[in-house]
A protein has these predicted regions:
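Conserved acetyl-CoA-binding loop-helix of GNAT-fold acetyltransferases
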Residues: 65-71, 188, 198-214, 233-237
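Conserved hydrophobic beta-strand within the GNAT/NAT acetyltransferase core sheet
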Residues: 190, 220-224
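Glycine-rich acetyl-CoA-binding "A-motif" of GNAT/NAT acetyltransferases
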Residues: 44-45, 171-174, 230
Length: 257
């Protein structure tokens, strides 16, 4: 397995679009997010793996255990790996036991338009405004470091991602983001300032973000840690269906010999 241009047109078809965190994967392949790729052949690949700048990794469809082992070892040769892997995978090949597993839930994708989202937007409290994300606003946001880390810079996020804040005058009440966009789907996330939690602002903020996504023809995907009950409740309010459990399988970098 050797490096290949992550934007190679031959790569997207190798990957299952139903993989967990697929908007991140296809965002990397489409050049919206930083990342790297390796493949068995740089000209006509049949096996490939992709890794985000923050370490989340994806392996293409495989039919044999040997192919999966080869791809995972290829990733681990150069970095610590967090492999996104569905708990309900039915393939004959399975990854080797990880050093640790982070249990996650994936929801969707679902359309970014609908009556439920319209009603949530109508619930915007009096005196609260919606402000699109810009550099000055993002500099004040709680999740600035997360989106900057995912994109490599604030400017890159503002170019390739989408965000907004719910504001009361100059106070940030909630931040909603679509940091990962790929394959026609945006993964969305939200954080409410601690003083304003429990007021339904998280789902309202995402509903307003969804209007922007719908204008761009994008669907919505949601993911969170299994034990994040508040996030699961927000997903339900937004209209996401049953969760699909998956794991981020954490592997140490292989020792150099």
């Amino acid at each position: 397995m050797d490096p290949i241009d992550v934007r190679s047109a031959s790569l997207p078809a190798l990957f299952d679009p139903a993989l967990p965190n697929a908007p991140m994967l296809f965002g990397i392949l489409e050049g919206r997010l930083p990342g790297r790729a390796i493949a068995d052949d740089s000209r006509v690949p049949t096996l490939a793996a992709v890794q985000s700048a923050e370490g989340i990794a994806f392996i293409s469809r495989t039919t044999t255990q040997a192919a999966l082992d080869t791809a995972l070892s290829g990733l681990r040769r150069d970095a610590i790996v967090g492999l996104a892997w569905p708990d309900d995978a039915t393939a004959a090949a399975i990854p080797e036991p990880p050093a640790r597993k982070q249990d996650r839930l994936g929801f969707g994708p679902i359309p970014a338009a609908g009556d439920r989202l319209d009603r949530l937007r109508d619930d915007l409290p009096t005196g609260v405004t919606v402000r699109p994300m810009d550099a000055d606003l993002l500099a004040r946001c709680e999740w600035r470091g997360l989106v900057e880390g995912a994109h490599g810079s604030i400017d890159a996020f503002l170019e390739h991602g989408i965000g907004l804040c719910l504001m009361r005058e100059d106070e940030i009440l909630a931040e909603a983001y679509a940091p990962f966009i790929g394959g026609g789907v945006a993964e969305v996330g939200v954080v409410t300032s601690e003083a304003h939690r429990g007021q339904g602002l998280a789902s309202i903020a995402i509903a307003w973000l969804a209007a922007d996504l719908a204008e761009r023809g994008l669907g919505m995907y949601w993911s969170c840690d299994t034990d994040n009950e508040a996030s699961v409740r927000v997903a339900g309010k937004l209209g996401f269906g049953p969760a699909r459990p998956f794991g981020i399988l954490l592997y140490r970098q292989l020792a150099q010999v």
